[in-house]
Amino acid sequence: LQPRRTEAMQADLLIHADWVLPVDASDSTLASHSLAVADGHIAALLPRAQAEAQIDAAKTLELPGHALMPGLVNAHTHSPMSLLRGLADDLPLMTWLHEHIWPAEGRWVDQEFVADGTRLALLEMLRGGITCFNDMYFHAEVTGRVCAEAGMRVLAGMIVVDFPTRYADNADEYLRRGLELHEHYRDHPLVRPAFAPHSTYAVSEEPLARVRTLADELEVQVHIHLHETRDEVQQVLRAHGERPIARLDRLGLLGPQLVAVHMTQLEGDEIARLAETGTQVVHCPESNMKLASGFCPVQDLLAAGVNVALGTDGAASNNDLNLFGEMRTAALLAKGVAGSANAVPAAQALRLATWNGAKALGLEDAIGSLEVGKAADIVAVDLGDPHTQPLYHPCSQLVYAASSHQVRHVWIRGREVLRDGAPLTLDPPTIIEAARQWGARIAEA
């Protein structure tokens, strides 16, 4: 009798790489493995010999010297603010906001600004291996449209503030526009709406309570700046007799749906309460240092069981959208703040920028790791550069030595959006020219 031949698995794409870092439960580094993609999802992750024997792929890609990793998740940014990069630097947060950023936004922000700024941000993020980001800005419907066209995954933040802008006159109008955004994108595979009340000092109690009710009804995340600076905490304490976290807790907003950004001013009981409620925290180390806002106690949060993700913040306060840089800075800063060399080791830093980010955005079942059944959001990094050689530990090199320019290929939901470092869904010359024109207009004003 002849042995029964096993029918080959059909796949759209089979990638052979020297290393795969799936960001699984054991933080594995898999040598000489292959990853198969079918219908936009990961169909198999196998040793190369098994993959060659068992998988029949429409296309095969050889990536010697490369590591495959999950797409990076930028858990907090303001993508259109890429057009304000370098407008005002070396200033504390409130001076930066009140005297420079908010006046510029009041004059310039419209749908064209948001579209051009978002495209510039997408170009930078895709080239740096970011496949999903959590955005907070005006005209989120435009950001959603641009991301859908480019094949980028986004949580489009439906912003809420008390004061009038060119976008809306009051909190009611912000919420109405947010609900329209949700209705438009509620079933979109890449664009997912979220509420984005700016902060506890820019949004009063009634709109915050409405955000909580609507977020519960619609099952969406709530994205907010929280405990960013000492002055913010003191301002809210004087105005309301309680610290911002306590205020949100009283309003019922703490919980897994809340994405709390910055969190540099935390006391022990607040960390315990964040852990108890399952509240998500986003650490933006480079922006916080540049604005002298303080240090997020990442090691204490992680030790307490709080999920911590990484964000770049906007390009106006960072001044780049480079999560490779944020991983390295987060790992180094955590060691200095905790006084411990093993605080946030390389594998944990990579997790902050991938799986933890996905969890913060409520997407951990779909993205954040390279596992069978998840969406094929994949990044290939060339580790052949001088500063990532020799290669003893791929994860350490990715976190402590690699640069965003080493990202060579990117797929989102199985669609190739970056090939050999060149974007396939964006037009760089047009985007850069639009940015130059905006820069000239703003500088001359």
How would you describe each model-predicted region?
Residues L1-H33, V37-A43, R48, Q54, ...:
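Active-site microenvironment of metallo-dependent hydrolases
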Residues V142-T264:
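Metal-coordinating catalytic core of metallo-dependent amide/deamination hydrolases
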Residues R85-G151, Y174-D187, R436-E444:
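Alpha-helical scaffold segments that flank or form the walls of functional sites
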Residues L83-D116, R153-D172, R230-Q257, T277-Q280, ...:
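Active-site gating loops and adjacent loop-to-helix segments of metal-dependent hydrolytic enzymes
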Residues R250-Q257, Q299-D385, A401-A402:
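His/Asp/Glu-enriched, well-ordered alpha-helical/loop segment
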Residues L72-P80, H223-H225, H262, D313:
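Histidine-centered divalent metal-coordination motifs
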Residues N134-Y137, A194-R210, M289-L291, A360-G362:
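Active-site glycine- and acidic-residue-rich loops that bind
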